[in-house]
């Protein structure tokens, strides 16, 4: 019989009634949208319920219109409070860090952080647009283009370091060797100290203590901005001006700098430019676009038809320069190509015309390494190339060689390319492979003859200046005479073998005033010739000053036969300086525009400034070289310095670099021309100097913005220790140490 189910006893029934209640379904105040639409159970977890997590749905909670009293769990509110508290704590810590980092930047005029912000490049650019964009051009009145399909560079300087670190102001130390103008000026200043019986003057102006010493100048970094405030469009590396402006700048470059330094093939450059212009610059090589911007930067720097104000031209040029930096600055350190080498050469040339002399030298080192890595020095790398490519690779290497000698002379540092590496690398003269028929290649001829002239300069640097190596061995007067005579013979032989269309011109020649491309090259060659002649004969002028300005009995010794010969040969240096000033003065007084035959203004500035220093040396010789003043020579030297002042005043307008050279030559010439140190003599000398010049110091616009380049000049060339205990200054009769350096921003 089946077993009957047992009925629970009364005790068991009572226990079940008083026991814990059974679990009921927990109701939530608001279900998520997915669970409500599926009509499934929702556990109400935030931010995502378990059902949505398992099914991969987006969990969203949206109260309905009738949900006026939504129940929110206490644990959810507690979790929100903890998260808010954590965020507030992190923000407070970050705020404390930023306070320590930004507190030194409150003073915008003196803060190193502020200066670093100004000198930094453009901030991190936004992504390039997907189509050509029209915006304001650098001129502010024209439409512009923005190249696309380019990777935007990242500016690391614009990223905060987050370390609450404050950088102190850096100092720049530079060595200027025996061939530099700075070293020659140091010799003149020591001779001035001897002439005025300064107790702090060296006991003897021997070559080991003067010409052979290291001239190291510590100068502060410039605190002024290098350009005007750029618009967001200008800060884009891919931004370009209007087509009309680009065409004008291209024509200007290939008519000026492209003729003097013909290392870029114009036809190839214009072909690529036209292709990019037709496609709206939607596809362009980064290296080519960077080179194009450097071409624009150079052209706009000496485009005086755009504006006569150098400040405005520089602001415009600096926009293109920064764009080129944004495109190729980092790329040039890891990519080897001919376009990168061209870009770097243009950077070096551009920096020579600005206050970026340190950048010019540093970038030139990168030019050398990139060119050698590309094999421009080797003929074997050209076997698979066509004649045009071979020729322009060779021209690029020759331009680098010429720049090597120019920079080595200007700053007095060892050259990087020995003459042995130029074997069979001379550019072809006559007809270029790019020209058709019998058309002459004027830029190619000019580069070929310039190359041979710079080979003579290279020999002068090695033989006469010890390759600018701070060497202990010194040449005696006989060795200087022999070296100068041999190099002068080579230089004159070079001039005699010039082709008819590139012959040198004299002061009275009509070539100076007939503005043609060939005549401009002839004038430039003439200035280069006289500048090299100054370099060859300057050791003899230095030897003369060393002999004349010796303290004690050495100054009264009878001059030897060799010293007499050195003095006679030193006049060749003075003659070349005089011809340089006369030629430039003849051109600039008739035509002061950029279309004259002088070429790029900053190379003319270098030639005239070098010649002016030589004239100052001859003025010092005439005033203090003997017991009797050579009044005729002193008067003629002052007349030449007056011409040089006219050149500086007309060479450019509102140009701080030109004004710095003018101010420096003025003050140095006053120091060389004062016979006594009394206030009356100083006043008389200043009056005489002003009467011989065409412009007055008061009329010159030399504001605070222009003082920074002069401060660099003065701190590099002046050594205040020379005039220790020299109570009277040769200028204005003021205390030299306590007054001159406080009144003039020369530094120390």
UniProtKB/Swiss-Prot annotation:
Induction: Expression is induced in response to 2-benzoxasolinone (BOA) exposure. Residues 131-141 have a biased composition (Low complexity). The keyword Magnesium does not apply. Pfam families: Fungal_trans, Zn_clus. One of its GO terms (molecular function) is DNA-binding transcription factor activity, RNA polymerase II-specific. It is found in: Nucleus. InterPro entries: Fungal_SecMet_Regulators, Transcription_factor_dom_fun, Zn2-C6_fun-type_DNA-bd_sf, Zn2Cys6_DnaBD. Residues 11-21, 429-438 have a biased composition (Polar residues). GO terms for biological process: DNA-templated transcription; positive regulation of transcription from RNA polymerase II promoter by galactose. Residues 1-10 have a biased composition (Basic and acidic residues). One of its GO terms (cellular component) is nucleus. Disruption phenotype: Decreases, but does not eliminate the ability to metabolize 2-benzoxasolinone (BOA). Signal peptide: none annotated. Transcription factor; part of the Fusarium detoxification of benzoxazolinone cluster 2 (FDB2) involved in the degradation of benzoxazolinones produced by the host plant. Maize, wheat, and rye produce the 2 benzoxazinone phytoanticipins 2,4-dihy-droxy-7-methoxy-1,4-benzoxazin-3-one (DIMBOA) and 2,4-dihydroxy-1,4-benzoxazin-3-one (DIBOA) that, due to their inherent instability once released, spontaneously degrade to the more stable corresponding benzoxazolinones, 6-methoxy-2-benzoxazolinone (MBOA) and 2-benzoxazolinone (BOA), respectively. Fusarium verticillioides possesses 2 unlinked loci, FDB1 and FDB2, necessary for detoxification of antimicrobial compounds produced by maize, including 2-benzoxazolinone (BOA). The FDB2 cluster arose as a duplication of the FDB1 cluster with rearrangement and expansion by incorporating additional genes. PANTHER family: REGULATORY PROTEIN GAL4. This is Transcription factor FBD3. It comes from Gibberella moniliformis (strain M3125 / FGSC 7600) (Maize ear and stalk rot fungus). The gene is FDB3.
